[in-house]
Each structure stands twice: as structure tokens, then as C-alpha cells.
């Protein structure tokens, strides 16, 4: 698909595995995303994967393909800016910090704490997840690349720098 749409430079992937990545390996899916990005000069924005329903593990590692080194991986925060209860953590290969950024993905048990999306019947659905945070970052990245004319590397670096701030702690 990427090869047939060379004018599209930013691709959103709001999907991911329920399984955790292995500590010292890159998944085949992530390796393929990295290859495509290099070969076609595109960027993938990947949802940081959610902790599956029913799993009580608090510090669950991200799932594939969020272990892609060159993709912009997005976690979710609630509307107060706190990490959402379902988000997962990196690192990848023990030292690459993933996810790269976080954005509003909704959280909580009441509808006002969630994201509002359109349904097929023209109604509204109240949802939460990293899959709803990632498209917002895709839009920002596409703006920097397509409108501002920045390279994908510079655009990604600007978004990460703006998100991390100077007081970043990687505990």
C-alpha cells in the first residue's frame, strides 16, 4: 500500500498485540515497519498498545508493532494529563524509550472521561485507548511534514522534544 501511495508520508496504525514484546528482541512486524520507513521515506505513528481487559499487571511492556524503533509510538493520558490506566511501557532493547509521546486517549469509568467518536448510526460513542490518541499525533506529524516542509526526522524530533520537556525522568 505504501509503495502505491508515495504522496502519503504519514501512516497511522491504531492496532497492536495483546502480548508483551520480548526484552532483547524486535518483533518481525516492527522490523518490517522500520524497513518500510527507511525504504519509502515515510513515518508510521503506532498506538502504544493497551493493557488487555482482565489483565491486572500494572507495568506491562508494550506490544508489537509498538517496538518499532523508527515509528512514533503514542501512549494515552487522561484529561488531567495523567498516564491512562491501560497504557503500557517500554523500553525496547533495554534502552530505546518507548512510547515516544502521549496524547489524550480518555480514561475512567464515566462517559465524560472518555473520547467521543462518531458511530455508523450517526450517534456518538464514548471510548478510550491509545488507538484514539495516535491519530492526533499523526495529524500533528503530517502537518509538520506536508505543510511546514520538515523532514520526517526533524518533525518527529520536534514532537518528542515538545512532549518530553527538560525534566524527563525515565524511571
Regions found by a protein language model. Name each.
Residues 1-64, 124-128, 132-133:
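Substrate-binding/access-modulating region of protease and related hydrolase catalytic domains
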Residues 2-5, 144-150:
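Flexible, small-residue-rich helix->loop connector segments that border functional cores
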Residues 5, 68, 162:
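Acidic-histidine catalytic/liganding microenvironments
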Residues 23-30, 59, 68, 95, ...:
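Conserved structured core elements
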Residues 17, 48-52, 77-79, 107, ...:
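Acidic, glycine-rich active-site loops and adjacent beta-strand->loop/helix elements
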Residues 61-142:
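Extracellular S/T/G-rich loop segment that most often corresponds to the catalytic His/Ser-adjacent loop
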Residues 146-171:
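C-terminal subdomain of the subtilisin-like protease fold in secreted/lumenal serine endopeptidases
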